[in-house]
Amino acid sequence: MPEPAKSAPAPKKGSKKAVTKTQKKGDKKRRKTRKESYAIYVYKVLKQVHPDTGISSKAMGIMNSFVNDIFERIAGEASRLAHYNKRSTITSREIQTAVRLLLPGELAKHAVSEGTKAVTKYTSSK
């Protein structure tokens, strides 16, 4: 039996027709996916504390993991506290209590004072 005539070649695996239709003349086919990171903030703090010191990409990766881990722990604890108190909103009070519960002694005191300072600065700039 004769094969049916093909009008156009089959699209390659993973390609999408809609992408080629909406494409403009100078655009590339795929954009680089954005990877969120705390790297710029870690670098800014490093330069405030030690202006003449650099950081390797491996160390930056570790710092990024550390910040993500602490963020998740504080957010989880604050969420639990809000749930216990039958609240649907996480406020600075829940965050502060979560920090006190998660961080040990002197570190918690410093974190709370820095957090309070940051919130005060933010509310005064509004």
Curated annotation (Swiss-Prot):
CDD domains: HFD_H2B
Glycosylation site residues: S113
Protein localization: Nucleus; Chromosome
Bias (Low complexity): 1-12
Transmembrane segments: none
Region (Disordered) residue spans: 1-34
Recorded family membership: Belongs to the histone H2B family.
Quaternary structure (record): The nucleosome is a histone octamer containing two molecules each of H2A, H2B, H3 and H4 assembled in one H3-H4 heterotetramer and two H2A-H2B heterodimers. The octamer wraps approximately 147 bp of DNA.
Name of the protein described by the UniProt record: Histone H2B 3
